[in-house]
Amino acid sequence: MKAFPTFALLFLVLLFSAHVSDAQHWSYGLRPGGKRDTESLQDMYHETPNEVALFPELERLECSVPQSRLNVLRGALMNWLEGENRKKI
């Protein structure tokens, strides 16, 4: 009677491992091993010259309300202290 649960567990493990190991996806145009034919790649991907600028110029966004560096430092210090107080509680 003790052998039945062992064989049932072994059967389930083999069943699930076979399902996981049979998970290779075959796409159209793929050869076994995941290698594509180089001629078909050239046909699929045509180079598009200069459609998108590589490094667009960034706009500078400025705040309409000037803040002093002291206020920014004070805010950062207060946030840090609040975080330390939460850790202690």
Curated annotation (Swiss-Prot):
Glycine amide modifications at: 33
Pfam annotation, one family: GnRH
GO CC field: extracellular space
Coiled-coil portions: none
Modification Pyrrolidone carboxylic acid, positions: 24
Top-level taxon: Eukaryota
An annotated Gene Ontology molecular function: gonadotropin hormone-releasing hormone activity
Subcellular location: Secreted
Expression (tissue specificity): Expressed in the forebrain from larval stages.
Signal peptide (from-to): 1-23
Keywords: Amidation, Cleavage on pair of basic residues, Hormone, Pyrrolidone carboxylic acid, Secreted, Signal
Family: Belongs to the GnRH family.
Record function comment: Stimulates the secretion of gonadotropins.
Protein name: Progonadoliberin-1
This protein's encoding gene: gnrh1
